[in-house]
Structures are given as structure tokens and as C-alpha cells.
């Protein structure tokens, strides 16, 4: 079985307001995590005021724990303070504590934390891939990948996923490194999805940008499962690390998503506002991607999946929020422990775009979120039946072949 990444985060179905703070409700079927929440602060909050708020939360939570009958909860876990944009935190709180937090005038909204996971579709081992050849050619059916020898050299791709087998031969014994882990205590890809995605971005055989550096940011465990709060923490870590090394030389790939989540979209927007290019899978439910997050965030590059025959993959989401199509059906790339496997999904399409972004940065095309416009301008108008109100543009690296 191949893999499609699917997140089941929080939906903005409706909102209740208590003294100014929205408590966002969830749609039926969303797998929320019991008594776990994400709290987002008002825009423009200073670090000093944020520290003061969190101190109040910790004090209030401790007082509640020692009261008779107060339910034992873990309290605050992750703190979010993106270099630009989103400030907030996640944690384990009872209903009364959340009501107290919601009364604060400095709180913008609260969402329930939710489970994130990947779903399997199909897998066939050891067959040739077509995606690379399609990216480097203006005509379908080719078997050769044409590209400039710069191949993304000097760029860094952050893969927010299940981790990456950094020892895989695809990464030449050093181009892939471990970043951070917000999923479990095992710094390895015990699922396989993240290694496949990394190989499409920067593998020496399967990669679009064959000389780019890969950084593994693990937010999903061996079962392909994690939390929305952990994913956002991975997004923050990647943004901060990219900015410390040069945001204009960095790209981020997120082959995950799901139902609309304001927090997820706000975090994606913060990456873009931080000057970092972000490619995101459109989703695999054959619906309008405006219903998905972070795919529906307009400041990022949202990618739908195409077939070898230049059609829309039957599972791919569509709609006005889609920026481009990229190969996503039956894509060969690396698997943990060596060798390759074939997976399908918009999860496989998105890293073609992240790799193309790194490739173009290496060519001196400039970096940052505006690179998505360059990619759209270079794309070719070939996708058949792309879906209602959807672009028919397929990515191309401009090699002229």
C-alpha cells in the first residue's frame, strides 16, 4: 500500500465567544484529543505581555490542581512564538481552566487539539518513476530528467513529516541531517513517508534538487500519527532554523493537511511572513481544497496531484486555492533502510514543488513565498479536467526540453 498524508485537525464550523475570546467548535468526525487545546494570542502581542500571560496560566493551573476535586492535567506543553505572526501555546487543561483562559482579553481564539495521521492507498516496489522526467520536459512520456547542474546546491529543505532516514544512500552520506522531533523519542523514520518525500525533494536519484540539503523535522510517529499542536511546533522550529541560516535559501515541505483549522493556517502564514517558501499538499479527498488546512492559506504554495497522462489524480483536491499541479500518482522515491518504493498522493506532488523551489533558488531566482509566483509563471498549461475553478498548470523546471 502507498501512502497519502491526511491530517484530521480542527474545523472552524462555528465559534462561541466568551468575553472576547472565540472557542472554535469542531465538525462531526474530527478526532479531537481529550482535554487538549491550542490557545492563540491577539495579533501584535509583545513578548513581555506573552510571558506575563503564560505565568498567569501556570499559576492558575497549579492552584486548580491543589483544590479538592480538581482534575489532574498536565498544563502547558508547547509554546508558540513564531519570528513573525503567531503567538500561543498548547496544553492539557480541564473545561473550567479553558473557560478562565477564554475570559482573558489578550486571547484571540482557542481550538481543541486534534489527531494528525496518514492514510494508505497503494504501493508497488521497484518500478521506474515518471515524475522527474515530467518536471524537466514540456511533453509527457519522457524517460530523461533534464536539469541544470547547480541542482539546488547551497539550499536547505525542511521536511515536516515522519522523519527521514538520513543515512539513506540517496543523500550522499551527509546532505540529510536530523532537525527536531515533536512526535516521539525515536529520531528515525519508522514509517517511511518522510523518507519518500525527502527523496523527491533532494535524493541523488529521485530528487528534483539533487544537491540540496535535507533537514528532518518529525511531527508524526511510526504509525503516521501525531497532534496538531506538535505539527505547529515543528513549523515554528523550521522557521526559526531557516531564518538563522538564511530564509532566502530555505524551503519547507508539508505533505500533510486536513479539515480547515485556523491555527494551522495562521502558522503557515507565519512561515511565509518569515520569508520562507512553503509547499503544502492540497489534500486527497477529491473536494475543494478551500475546506482543507493549511492548503487553504493563500500566502503559501498549494499543490494538487497529476497523473502520468497529465490528468487530475482522482483522489486530488482541487479549487481556486490550488496554485499548481505536480506529479503525484505512482511516484518512486526512497524508503528507510535503502532502496525505493512507490507511493501516491498529493503528499508526493508537494515535494516536487519544494524541490523545484530549491532548484530555482540555486539558479539565482530568489527565495521566499514569492517564488510560488515564479513557479506558476514557468508552469505549462496541460492538465486535463483539473476540477472546478482550478488551474490547469503543471510545474516545469524551464530546461527547455
Curated annotation (Swiss-Prot):
Residues 129-401 form the Peptidase S8 domain. Residues 1-20 form the signal peptide. Residues 36-118 form the Inhibitor I9 domain. Glycans are attached at residues 58, 223, 253, 397. GO terms for biological process: proteolysis. Its main location: secreted. Keywords: Glycoprotein, Hydrolase, Protease, Secreted, Serine protease, Signal, Virulence, Zymogen. Secreted subtilisin-like serine protease with keratinolytic activity that contributes to pathogenicity. PANTHER family: CEREVISIN-RELATED (PTHR43806:SF11), PEPTIDASE S8 (PTHR43806). Belongs to the peptidase S8 family. This is Subtilisin-like protease 7. It comes from Trichophyton equinum (Horse ringworm fungus).
Amino acid at each position: 500500500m502507498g501512502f497519502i498524508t491526511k491530517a484530521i485537525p480542527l474545523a472552524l464550523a462555528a465559534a462561541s465567544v466568551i468575553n472576547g475570546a472565540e472557542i472554535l467548535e469542531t465538525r462531526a468526525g474530527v478526532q479531537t484529543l481529550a482535554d487538549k487545546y491550542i490557545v492563540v494570542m491577539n495579533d501584535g502581542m509583545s513578548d513581555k505581555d506573552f510571558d506575563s500571560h503564560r505565568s498567569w496560566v501556570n499559576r492558575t493551573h497549579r492552584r486548580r490542581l491543589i483544590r479538592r476535586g480538581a482534575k489532574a492535567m498536565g498544563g502547558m506543553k508547547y509554546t508558540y512564538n513564531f519570528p513573525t505572526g503567531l503567538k500561543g501555546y498548547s496544553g492539557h487543561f480541564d473545561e473550567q481552566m479553558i473557560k478562565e483562559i477564554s475570559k482573558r482579553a489578550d486571547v484571540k481564539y482557542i481550538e481543541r487539539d486534534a489527531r494528525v495521521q496518514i492514510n494508505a492507498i497503494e504501493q508497488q516496489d521497484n518500478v521506474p518513476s515518471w515524475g522527474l522526467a515530467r518536471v524537466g520536459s514540456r511533453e509527457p512520456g519522457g524517460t530523461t530528467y533534464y536539469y541544470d547542474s547547480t541542482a539546488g546546491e547551497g539550499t536547505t529543505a525542511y521536511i515536516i513529516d515522519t522523519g527521514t532516514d538520513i543515512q539513506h544512500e540517496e543523500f550522499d552520506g551527509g546532505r540529510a541531517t536530523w532537525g527536531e522531533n515533536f512526535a516521539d523519542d525515536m529520531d528515525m523514520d519508522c514509517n517511511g513517508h518522510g523518507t519518500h518525500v525527502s527523496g523527491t525533494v533532494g535524493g541523488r536519484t529521485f530528487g528534483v534538487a539533487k544537491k540540496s540539503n535535507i533537514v528532518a523535522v518529525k511531527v508524526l510517529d511510526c504509525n503516521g500519527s501525531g497532534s496538531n499542536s506538535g505539527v505547529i511546533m515543528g513549523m515554528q522550529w523550521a522557521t526559526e532554523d531557516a531564518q538563522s541560516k538564511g530564509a532566502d535559501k530555505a524551503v519547507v515541505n508539508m505533505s500533510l493537511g486536513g479539515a480547515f483549522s485556523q491555527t494551522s493556517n495562521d502558522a503557515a502564514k507565519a512561515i511565509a511572513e518569515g520569508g520562507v517558501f512553503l509547499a503544502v499538499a492540497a489534500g486527497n479527498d477529491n473536494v475543494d481544497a478551500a475546506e482543507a488546512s493549511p492548503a487553504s492559506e493563500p500566502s503559501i504554495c498549494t499543490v494538487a496531484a497529476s497523473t502520468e497522462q497529465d490528468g487530475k489524480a482522482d483522489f486530488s483536491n482541487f479549487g481556486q486555492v490550488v496554485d499548481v499541479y505536480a506529479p503525484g500518482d505512482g511516484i518512486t522515491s526512497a524508503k528507510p533502510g535503502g532502496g525505493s518504493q512507490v507511493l501516491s498522493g498529493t503528499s508526493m506532488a508537494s515535494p516536487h514543488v519544494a524541490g523545484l523551489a530549491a532548484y530555482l533558488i540555486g539558479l539565482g531566482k530568489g527565495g521566499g513565498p514569492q517564488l510560488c509566483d515564479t513557479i506558476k509563471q514557468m508552469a505549462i498549461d496541460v492538465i486535463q479536467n483539473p476540477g472546478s475553478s482550478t488551474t490547469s498548470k503543471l510545474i516545469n523546471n524551464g530546461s527547455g526540453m
